[in-house]
Amino acid sequence: MALTAFTSREGGYSAPPYSSLNLGMHVGDDPSVVARNRALVDEMYGPVAYMNQSHSDVVVEVDHATNVDADAMITRTPVVVLAVQIADCIPLLLEGESSVAAVHVGRRGLLNGITDKTLNLMAEENVVAYLGPSICGRCYEVGADVFEEVVAQFPLAASTTETGALALDLPGALSAHLTLRGVAVVRDPRCTVEDATLFSYRRDGVTGRQAGLISL
């Protein structure tokens, strides 16, 4: 069985507004402090491979701890832990019998098909998907143009905020899509905006990044 974990913002060294277990090197935090935070994660879970994420559909296969330009990683070796960094997007972890993957799924990732691309490259018959904490359908308010673009392709993404504004339920849409593909889904119900123990770009603007982690 694969190792899976989702970090929070607690237990690290970073000062506000990145306090404290910020794992993102690209958010303005002191790189030396982020390195200390990443070392803590290495000590707990093993050597970690990270991605420079850009909402692309790039999937890379890795066999050692590295840093790659991609939005999904696959490995077929147990010697590396895969990390996906988020602060509202969905950290999607995929567990197969002989491979695992970490996928960054935001609105653009949902539309560009990076999840299907990763599943196809894994080429596994039995896959379990773990969806970590992300922004929920009550909090992800969007404009009409964005709403219509996403809902045209994923009708189950349609949602509203508590005030009735248009919103998107990305984890709900992704869960339904995975289920249709025959993938078993395990979903963490926490919302990054609503849970103060998690980083949220939508809530805070300048902030850190937590991670979803998976290894064979």
What are these regions (language model features)?
Residues 1-216:
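Active-site microenvironment for binding and transforming phosphate-containing groups
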